[in-house]
Amino acid sequence: MLWFKNLMVYRLSRDVSLRAEEMEKQLASMAFTPCGSQDMAKMGWVAPMGSHSDALTHVANGQIVICARKEEKILPSPVIKQALEAKIAKLEAEQARKLKKTEKDSLKDEVLHSLLPRAFSRFSQTMMWIDTVNGLIMVDCASAKKAEDTLALLRKSLGSLPVVPLTLENPIELTLTEWVRSGSAAQGFQLLDEAELKSLLEDGGVIRAKKQDLTSEEITNHIEAGKVVTKLALDWQQRVQFVMCDDGSLKRLKFCDELRDQNEDIDREDFAQRFDADFILMTGELAALIQNLIEGLGGEAQR
């Protein structure tokens, strides 16, 4: 099981029926296929269990995991520039004149298409967890754009997907700042030794503290000077550590060894059983963590 490393959290904005059997067929219509000779990028669904299963969905206890794969052709700018300049020089020599800008622009497209079949590919995979019990969707990535791209693929596959980023009643940075100022987080959470503080002024500074006592006078002085905490490393019940960000995302999730070893009694050769057990364990822990976090940060904004 690929334990999630990051969480971008989204709320289903209205009740929708997300049944795995139906979803399996819908995702199959947009299953991943590699780039053709003239494709810059392709994105589609693959089995979350990799070569161990053909199923595009994996379901347990009302939780669904799916996986998107993206292939991107890599064409470094210097390579394009060099090929374009050579082509322009050749044509200008043959025609004994300088090419116009419009001619050069169309040549760039030609060069791009001629290079594409020989370009290397970069592959990436993004896991998505759909919590049908709590009406949430979590994407395992660190960037909002990547999460939105994956959600867009799901929306296209399903026909519609009414989701919005999870929004809290109070600004997250103000709550995090208060936790650091008081030296105490919400119940179940503990401050660790890492934070980022930003000035509210447009051209103000950014302070990144690592391996530092966040209750120290130095940090307090930054807060008193008007900086707010935009990232804060936290521990939840000595089970999961993570960095809480002011955009509502959780980065660098780290599950304690005791938790990760809980399914060690399952034979590693039985990949499907281990994957299923780890998925149930991870989603159970993270669902509880998210609920605690929403409450600790002052509750979800009214919709």
Swiss-Prot record:
NCBIfam families per record: PRK00321.1-1, PRK00321.1-3, PRK00321.1-5
Family assignment from sequence similarity: Belongs to the RdgC family.
Predominant cellular place of this UniProt entry's protein: cytoplasm
Protein name per UniProt: Recombination-associated protein RdgC
Compartment list: Cytoplasm, Nucleoid
GO cellular component: bacterial nucleoid; cytoplasm
Pfam hit, one: RdgC
Entry's Gene Ontology BP terms: DNA recombination; regulation of DNA recombination
Functional summary from the UniProt entry: May be involved in recombination.
Signal sequence annotation: none
Keyword Isomerase applies: no
Domain of life: Bacteria
GO molecular function terms attached to this record: double-stranded DNA binding
Keyword Transmembrane helix annotated: no
Keywords from the UniProt entry: Cytoplasm, DNA recombination
